[in-house]
Regions:
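N-terminal alpha-helical transmembrane segments of multi-pass membrane transport
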Residues: 1-76, 86-93, 104, 397, ...
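Transmembrane helix-loop junctions in multi-pass membrane proteins
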Residues: 3, 20, 35-38, 77-82, ...
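Membrane-interface loop-to-helix entry segments
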Residues: 23-30, 34-47, 168-175, 182-243, ...
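Helix-loop-helix module between adjacent transmembrane segments
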Residues: 27, 31-32, 100-125, 132, ...
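Extracellular/periplasmic helix-exit of transmembrane alpha-helices
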Residues: 32, 111-119, 123, 225-241, ...
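Flexible loop linkers connecting adjacent transmembrane helices
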Residues: 37-62, 84-94, 98, 106-142, ...
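Alpha-helical membrane segments and immediately flanking helix-loop junctions
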Residues: 56-88, 114-138, 149-152, 156, ...
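Selective recognition of specific alpha-helical transmembrane segments in multi-pass small-molecule
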Residues: 103-111, 188-202, 213-233, 266, ...
C-alpha cells in the first residue's frame, strides 16, 4: 500500500505542479483585473441578490442554487482539509488559501455568468448547464473533445473524489472516534440516507440544502468563534505566523516538522480549491438550474459561495487550530480539529464537531451527486441516469473502507484534471464575460 500511496503522491505533485497553480491563480488574477476588482465593489450587492424574488426560467431558486453549491463545497475540506494544509504547509498555507479564495471569487463569478448564458434543456425538460455546455456552445463544436474531457473528469471527481470517498471516509473516522461506530455500519447508513434523496433529483437536493446548509454553517461558525474568543491572547501571534509563514516558511516546532514557502503555497492553494471549488467548474452546474434570466446576477450570487466557504468558514477553522496550538501536535490530520474542540468544550466538543462534519459531508455528497449526474448525462444521455445514481450510492458505501491519506491524494489528482478544461474555457470566453458584465453594470 505504501508504494501505491507514493505513486499517487508523485502523480499529485505532477498534476498540482507550478503550471496548474499558475493557470488557476492567474485566471483569477486576470479576471479580477479585467472586471475591475468586482469581488470588492459588488460583494454587498451580491449578498442582497441572494434574497431577491426569482424571476425567469429554471428548475430551482437562486438561493436554492447557491445552497446546493454551498452544500457541495462546505464539506470535510473546511475541517479536515484545512487541518491537512496547516499541518503540512504550516500557518502560511492559510494565507495562500485566502489569496486563492480572493481571486477565486472572480473565477466563480465568471463560471456562474457563463452557466446561465449557455445553459440548455435536456430531453426530460430539466435545465442542464455548466462548463461542458459553455465549452461546446460558447467555444464551438470543434472543442467538443474538451467538453467531454471535463465531463469525464467531473464524473470521476463525483464518484472517486470530493463527491464520495473523502466525505464518507472523514465521517466514519469521526463517528468511530466519538461514538465507537463501526465504519462499515456508518458507510451503509450514509449510503441509505443519500439514496433516499438523490433519486428525487435536483428539487429534493436543493430543498434539503436550503434547510440544512444555513443551520450547519451557523452552528460551526459560532463554535469556532467561541474557541478563538477563549484564546484571544493568541490571535495576534497566530496572524503573525500566518503572514510570516506565507513568505518565509515555518520552522519545525513541537510535533510540526517545518514547511517551506513552496509547501505553504502548494498546500494552501490546493486545499483552497478543494474547499471552495473556484475554477473547478462544479458550482456553475448548480448555478445553471437557477430561476433567472440575468447571467451577471447569478454570477454575483455564485461568488458569495467562495467568500462564505473560505474567507469565513475555512479561516475560522484555521485560526481555531492556530490559537489553540493543536496544529503543532503529533497525530493524524483527521483528529487535529477534533482535539481543538474537545480541548475547549470537553467531550461535548467532539460531539459538536462530529455532528457538524456529518452534516457538512452529507450535504457535500448530495451536491456532488447532482454535479456528477449532469456530467454523466452530457456523456450518455438521460436514459441511464438511474444507473449513475445507483453506482454513486455504491461508492458512498465503499468510502469508509479506504485509507484516508490515499483518498485525499486521489481527490487532489482528479480535481486538477477537472479544473484544466474549465480554466481554458474561462480564458477563451473572457471577452463574453467582460462584455456581459459591462452591459449589465451600465444599466
Amino acid at each position: 500500500m505504501d508504494h501505491v500511496l507514493q505513486f499517487f503522491q508523485q502523480l499529485d505533485n505532477l498534476v498540482w505542479g507550478a503550471p496548474l497553480l499558475v493557470l488557476l491563480v492567474g485566471t483569477g488574477i486576470y479576471l479580477t483585473l479585467r472586471l475591475g476588482l468586482l469581488q470588492i465593489r459588488y460583494l454587498p450587492k451580491a449578498f442582497r441578490l441572494i434574497f431577491t424574488e426569482d424571476e425567469g426560467h429554471g428548475d430551482i431558486s437562486s438561493f436554492g442554487a447557491l445552497a446546493t453549491a454551498l452544500a457541495a463545497t462546505v464539506g470535510t475540506g473546511n475541517i479536515v482539509g484545512v487541518a491537512t494544509a496547516i499541518q503540512t504547509g504550516g500557518p502560511g498555507a492559510l494565507f495562500w488559501m485566502w489569496m486563492a479564495a480572493f481571486f477565486g471569487m472572480a473565477t466563480k463569478y465568471a463560471e456562474g455568468l457563463l452557466a446561465i448564458r449557455y445553459r440548455t434543456k435536456d430531453d426530460n425538460g430539466h435545465i442542464s448547464g455548466g462548463p461542458m455546455y459553455y465549452i461546446l456552445h460558447g467555444m464551438g463544436e470543434k472543442w467538443r473533445p474538451l467538453a467531454i474531457f471535463f465531463a469525464v473528469a467531473g464524473v470521476l471527481v463525483a464518484l472517486f473524489g470530493i463527491g464520495t470517498m473523502t466525505q464518507v471516509n472523514s465521517i466514519t473516522g469521526f463517528l468511530q472516534a466519538s461514538f465507537g461506530t463501526a465504519p462499515e455500519v456508518a458507510s451503509v447508513v450514509i449510503a441509505l440516507v443519500v439514496s433516499t434523496i438523490i433519486f428525487g433529483g435536483i428539487h429534493w437536493i436543493s430543498k434539503v440544502s436550503e434547510k440544512v446548509v444555513p443551520f450547519m454553517a451557523a452552528a460551526y461558525i459560532f463554535a469556532t468563534i467561541t474557541i478563538i474568543a477563549l484564546h484571544l491572547d493568541q490571535l495576534l501571534p497566530a496572524l503573525k505566523a500566518v503572514f510570516s509563514g506565507a513568505f518565509t516558511g515555518t520552522a519545525a516546532m513541537g510535533g510540526f516538522a517545518g514547511a517551506t514557502v513552496k509547501m505553504a503555497i502548494q498546500k494552501g492553494v490546493a486545499r483552497g480549491v478543494f474547499s471552495n471549488e473556484s475554477g473547478l467548474g462544479s458550482a456553475p452546474i448548480a448555478a445553471a438550474a437557477a430561476k433567472t434570466n440575468e447571467p451577471v446576477e447569478q454570477g454575483l450570487i455564485s461568488m458569495t459561495g467562495t467568500f462564505i466557504d473560505t474567507i469565513i468558514i475555512c479561516s475560522l477553522t484555521g485560526l481555531s487550530l492556530l490559537v489553540s496550538g493543536e496544529w503543532m501536535a503529533r497525530g493524524s490530520t483527521s483528529t487535529l480539529t477534533q482535539d481543538t474542540f474537545t480541548g475547549v468544550f470537553g467531550p461535548v466538543g467532539g460531539i459538536i464537531l462530529t455532528l457538524c462534519l456529518v452534516l457538512f459531508a452529507t450535504t457535500t455528497i448530495l451536491g456532488w451527486s447532482y454535479y456528477g449526474e449532469r456530467c454523466f448525462e452530457f456523456l450518455f444521455g438521460v436514459k441511464h441516469i438511474n444507473l449513475y445514481r445507483t453506482f454513486f450510492v455504491f461508492m458512498v458505501g465503499l468510502g469508509g473502507f479506504l485509507k484516508l491519506d490515499l483518498v485525499w491524494v486521489i481527490a487532489d489528482i482528479v480535481n486538477g484534471l477537472m479544473a484544466l478544461p474549465n480554466l481554458i474555457a474561462l480564458l477563451a470566453l473572457s471577452p463574453v464575460i467582460i462584455k456581459e458584465s459591462k452591459q449589465y453594470f451600465k444599466k
